[in-house]
From Swiss-Prot:
This is Ribosome-recycling factor. InterPro entries: Ribosome_recyc_fac, Ribosome_recyc_fac_dom, RRF_sf. GO terms for cellular component: cytoplasm. Responsible for the release of ribosomes from messenger RNA at the termination of protein biosynthesis. May increase the efficiency of translation by recycling ribosomes from one round of translation to another. Residues 134-186 are annotated as: Disordered. Its main location: cytoplasm. The lineage of its organism: Bacteria, Pseudomonadati, Planctomycetota, Planctomycetia, Pirellulales. It is found in: Cytoplasm. GO terms for molecular function: ribosomal large subunit binding.
Amino acid sequence: MTSDEILMDAEERMDKAVSVLQNNLSGIRTGRANPGLVDSIKVEVYGSLTPLKQLASIGTPEPQQILIRPYDATTIKDIEKAIVAGDLGLNPQNDGRVIRLNVPPLSGEVRKKMVSRIKELAEEAKVSIRNIRRDANKAAETAEKDKEMTEDDRDKTKDQVQELTKKAETNVNESAKAREAEVMED
């Protein structure tokens, strides 16, 4: 592998790790309604598990309410069952056409749990990024042994991989801090 290939692969994988974290963080409840809380809930319908966002439009008509409008009215019971099973602490109100979810404000204890969950997710993302760094460094060493790059190129590649790692970890920290701030605000 060339230096450019190693760097491109590492950057791509690190960006993916950051985007997975951001996706996971969007599913963490804050004090206000957010479609991200429910859009990835899997609903068993038509014999398979389907993400809710493919079965219904999801909106927030009020700051404390999520409104779910199924595209097919026959799926409303399945959607309601999946929300209850999703263990979000939200009680769906089904009027036959739409499902309303009232998002209660978070208590202090729940906020602390959410913040600790955010920190866990951020740490998992950092571990993933460090593993990607290790793989990239190993690829650079292998390329040097196979005479595909010089020792100087290997060292330069390792330095660039470290820069990518710092950038990705900064993105992880910023995403986690922003979500923590959202959880802690009233």
